[in-house]
A protein has these predicted regions:
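Boundary/entry segment of secreted carbohydrate-active catalytic domains
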Residues: 1-29, 34-35, 40, 77-79, ...
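Aromatic-lined carbohydrate-recognition surfaces of secreted/lumenal glycan-active proteins
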Residues: 7-13, 67, 71-86, 124-158, ...
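Short, acidic/polar
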Residues: 13-31, 84-100, 151-163, 182-185, ...
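Active-site groove signature of glycoside hydrolases
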Residues: 35-47, 93-124, 236-243
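Glycoside hydrolase catalytic-domain groove-lining segments
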Residues: 56, 132, 136, 140-142, ...
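Substrate-binding cleft of secreted/luminal carbohydrate-active enzymes
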Residues: 174-181, 189, 198-260
Length: 260
């Protein structure tokens, strides 16, 4: 399998406005040698605004145009799971959306911290189990994307591990923007995820600013170049970047000129 490169999309409508519509977005994805775009489709049990109202038809069109151009569209959900019933309901919401929009894969964007995953180990198990059943029924790949060093968040590791147990791929958020180097951050993530056996496929910092973002557009481009080469050197099956709307032009230029 050739190495794949993906890009997250958080808020689709402003991205489409900036790019000039669905066709232009897909052209840009192709130029950047993206194998897939990863679009937020649900927050908890609620479908996200990228797939509701008038955006539902737009999302359908996006998937159709992407598939016509050999680009996959994966969806991602931020689970909250305050109860086991809620956990099952959230997974069922995701399953319905994945089926309706013919998504190529499903990503559990399960993160530690008060504003993200509310449940305990039982809720984590209920969510992971129901998601695995959904992915199997739909014959979709299932990814886990979370904080790249789960041990850093008090009490998160057991729940993280329980959810990840049901995934096919691990997409750790290696936001290296303020780290001493790209490699140092990836190495910490490798250590933090060493207990998992699924493929490690890191998420790079494709944005400028706080929360692990890069210091400047130029730094974003330079670090992306290092990150891509590191993924090649270590033979990771895939890698991705957070996120489309935050990616400076300098990063797109790297993607346009660097094979995946």
């Amino acid at each position: 399998m050739s190495r794949s490169r993906s890009m997250y999309i958080w808020k689709l409508e402003p991205v489409l406005a900036a790019e000039g519509g669905v066709n232009k977005l897909i052209e840009k994805a192709r130029r950047a040698k993206l194998s897939a775009i990863w679009v937020k489709v649900a927050d908890g049990a609620s479908p996200y605004r990228n797939v509701t109202g008038a955006m539902a038809a737009t999302m359908t069109n996006l998937v159709t145009r992407a598939h016509d151009n050999n680009v996959q569209v994966w969806g991602w959900q931020v689970p909250h799971c305050p109860t086991t019933q809620a956990a099952q309901d959230e997974a069922e919401t995701f399953r319905t959306l994945a089926q309706r929009f013919q998504l190529d894969g499903m990503i559990m964007d399960a993160e530690g911290g008060a504003e993200f995953f509310h449940g305990g180990i039982n809720e984590a198990r209920a969510y992971g189990t129901t998601m695995r059943q959904a992915a199997d029924a739909l014959q979709k790949s299932l990814g886990m994307s979370s904080n790249d060093i789960p041990q850093n968040i008090t009490g998160w590791l057991p729940r993280f591990t329980e959810i990840a147990r049901h995934a096919d791929f691990n997409f750790p958020q290696t936001y290296y923007g303020s780290s001493p180097s790209v490699a140092s951050r990836i190495d910490r993530a490798v250590n933090g995820n060493a207990h998992l056996t699924i493929p490690f496929a890191p998420v790079g910092a494709g944005y400028v600013g706080d929360g692990g973002g890069c210091a400047s557009a130029q730094a974003c481009a330079e670090r992306a170049t290092i990150f891509i080469q590191l993924c090649k050197d270590r033979d990771y099956p895939s890698y991705s970047f957070w996120h489309w709307a935050g990616a400076p032009m300098a990063l797109w230029e790297v993607l346009n000129t660097t094979p995946a």
